[in-house]
Every structure is written in structure tokens, then in C-alpha cells.
Amino acid sequence: MTKKLLVMAGGTGGHVFPAIAVVRELQQQGWEIRWLGTKDRMEADLVPKHGIPIEFIQISGLKGKGIKALLTAPFAILRAVLQAKKIINAYKPDAVLGMGGYVSGPGGIAAKLCGVPVILHEQNAVVGLTNVWLSKIARRTLQAFPTAFPNAEVVGNPVRQDLFEIAPPEQRFAEKGYPINILVMGGSQGALVINKTVLEVAKVLGQNVFISHQVGKGKLAGVEEVYQATGNGIASEFIDDMKAAYEWADLVICRSGALTVCEIAAAGLPAIFVPFQHKDRQQFLNAEYLAQVGAAMIIEQQDFTPESLLKALEPLIADRQKLTEMAIKARAKATPLAAKRVAEVIVENSL
């Protein structure tokens, strides 16, 4: 009989893309996959585009929703659990994989009530509240970084396998001269502080660098004009081919979401991280995974000025060997078998 998996993941690419990487591993083994998500988040469009059937429940976050939302939250959660329970009873999965997002909470509770094993994966270096609760009912808990749970197995973050096809840094960087290719990623929303600061620095650095700057949707205004004037960069709203972008780059400047950190390690690239300022310092702790081994630098957002960025960049631009050493250290922290290992744990713990 065909084995079945129900995947619970949604909200952001940091949850959805690692889950898709695991799905591909299990599909190769003949597993049938179905997804549990919400209609108003990115998984509603993204998952069907990858050929995966998706079911929906109604659930949303409570942050910043006010007193009314807090008072009605128990009823909303109960409704979502009952919706998920109905889907699980109809689909009859052999295992449920929780990868984060609002959907994982009620989905995990419903799976437990239905007697279906829950396998949990935490992508960030600090564990989210939903996964703290779910870890108490999960059959197995896995983590990307060693700092989230004290006793969970560390498997890394499942990332796209094509990134591991990129040649090793010592080979890629061997014949390179100038300019230094800098890949700047403002994220899908466009991090205003990164965009503004990099533009100021581009005016100073001249032809020693060439910048490929992903600014985010609707953020091109004024940016293209700067690079036309400086002649040392190009701007785009999105990057369609991330593998090609990583292969081209000598250095990355970006936020430090869990998936981004692990992709940069997989590609073998030095980075300057500007963590988003979460209360739990989630992105800072993600960035430390590479910074602690000398593969990356961290500049906190409140300190991220043209002066601090120039101070970080100038020694790297002057010393290509330093960039190569950082890149080699980054590649050493990659986890090419993460998706395979998560898939193995699902198989081992399925009904």
C-alpha cells in the first residue's frame, strides 16, 4: 500500500521551501503527499505550483490583533482543530510533518487526537511558541541548529539540492580578480534599511565592486538611477534563478532568515548579515551559526550605517583570500543530507 504524508507548513518561504525539499525525497520513494495550509498565505499559491494537493483550515496569528481576537482565540483554535481532524480522518496519513506556521498548531493537535505520529522540524535557532507546545506531543523533534531544543537531533535545514551542485569555493574563487561581485538581498518585502545603506556605499566603492541588488517588490524607484550613475550595479525586484545568483557572487549582504543562512552555507559564500529585529533575536541567532566559525559577519540593524558597512567591506574587498577562506568555512557548515534525514525519520516513525 502507498504510504501517505500530511505536511503542515505555511506563512513564509522559510517554512514552505524546506518542507517541499522533504516532499521531493519522499515522492522519490513512492509516498503520496498532501498539504495542510491556509487560504490567505503564500502556500495557497506556491504549493499547487509544485504539483502538491493542498487542503485548507481557518487559522491566523494573534499578534497585534487586540483583545477581541484574544477572547475569541480558543474558539478559533477549536474550529481549526476540528477542520484539521476532519481532513486527517478522510485522508488517513501514515505520518504528519510539522514545519511551522500558524497551521501547525491545530494540525498537530488534530493528528495527535487521530493517533497519527507527528514529526516536528524547527528551522530557526530559537524555537517558536507553537513548536514548544507541539514538541510535547511529537513522536520525533528535529532541528536545523543546535540551539533550539536541548535534546533534539540536529539535521540542518532542507534546502534545494541544486545549490550543492555549485562548485566548491576554492575552485570558484581561484581565477577571480576584480570587481568583487556583491549580491544584496533585501528579501521579498525589501528591507528598506539594507537598500538605503547599500546605495550610499555603492557611491563610494566605485569600480572595485559590482552589485546585484534585489530590492523587493515595488522598491525599484530611485535605485536604478543610482546604479546608472555609479556604473557598478544593477537592481531587480526579484531574483528568479537563485543558483545562478549564488554562483556569480563573491559576497552576500542580506537578512538572516533560517533558510537564507542555510542556502548561503550550501552555496559556500561569505556573508554580511543584518538580522531583522525580532524580540527573541531569532535572526541574530541564525546568523551566529556562520559568524561563530568566521564564515560571516553580523551588523545589527541599529548599527547598520554606510560607515559600519564600509568598515566591514573594505578589508574584504582588499583581500580576496579572506573571502575564499570565509566561503570555505561556510561550505563546511552546509547540511546536504538534511532533507534525506528528515525523510528517513518520517519513514521510521510512520504507522
UniProtKB/Swiss-Prot annotation:
Transmembrane stretches, start-end: none
A GO BP annotation: regulation of cell shape
Record field: catalytic activity: di-trans,octa-cis-undecaprenyl diphospho-N-acetyl-alpha-D-muramoyl-L-alanyl-D-glutamyl-meso-2,6-diaminopimeloyl-D-alanyl-D-alanine + UDP-N-acetyl-alpha-D-glucosamine = di-trans,octa-cis-undecaprenyl diphospho-[N-acetyl-alpha-D-glucosaminyl-(1->4)]-N-acetyl-alpha-D-muramoyl-L-alanyl-D-glutamyl-meso-2,6-diaminopimeloyl-D-alanyl-D-alanine + UDP + H(+)
Involved pathway(s): Cell wall biogenesis; peptidoglycan biosynthesis
Entry GO MF terms: UDP-N-acetyl-D-glucosamine:N-acetylmuramoyl-L-alanyl-D-glutamyl-meso-2,6-diaminopimelyl-D-alanyl-D-alanine-diphosphoundecaprenol 4-beta-N-acetylglucosaminlytransferase activity; undecaprenyldiphospho-muramoylpentapeptide beta-N-acetylglucosaminyltransferase activity
Class of the enzyme per the UniProt entry, highest EC level: transferase
Membrane topology value: Peripheral membrane protein
Keywords assigned: Cell cycle, Cell division, Cell inner membrane, Cell membrane, Cell shape, Cell wall biogenesis/degradation, Glycosyltransferase, Membrane, Peptidoglycan synthesis, Transferase
Keyword Glycosyltransferase: yes
SUPFAM superfamilies on file: UDP-Glycosyltransferase/glycogen phosphorylase
Residues the record lists as binding UDP-N-acetyl-alpha-D-glucosamine: T12, G13, G14, N124, R160, S188, I239, A258, L259, T260, V261, C262, E263, Q283
Chief subcellular location: membrane
Family matches, as Gene3D superfamilies: Glycogen Phosphorylase B
Pfam families per the UniProt record, alphabetical: Glyco_tran_28_C (PF04101), Glyco_transf_28 (PF03033)
Gene Ontology cellular-component annotations: plasma membrane
EC number(s) from the headed UniProt entry: 2.4.1.227
InterPro entries: GlcNAc_MurG, Glyco_trans_28_C, GlycoTrans_28_N
Localization terms from the record: Cell inner membrane
Annotated function: Cell wall formation. Catalyzes the transfer of a GlcNAc subunit on undecaprenyl-pyrophosphoryl-MurNAc-pentapeptide (lipid intermediate I) to form undecaprenyl-pyrophosphoryl-MurNAc-(pentapeptide)GlcNAc (lipid intermediate II).
Stated family: Belongs to the glycosyltransferase 28 family. MurG subfamily.
Name the UniProt record assigns to this protein: UDP-N-acetylglucosamine--N-acetylmuramyl-(pentapeptide) pyrophosphoryl-undecaprenol N-acetylglucosamine transferase
Higher taxonomy: Bacteria, Pseudomonadati, Pseudomonadota, Gammaproteobacteria, Pasteurellales
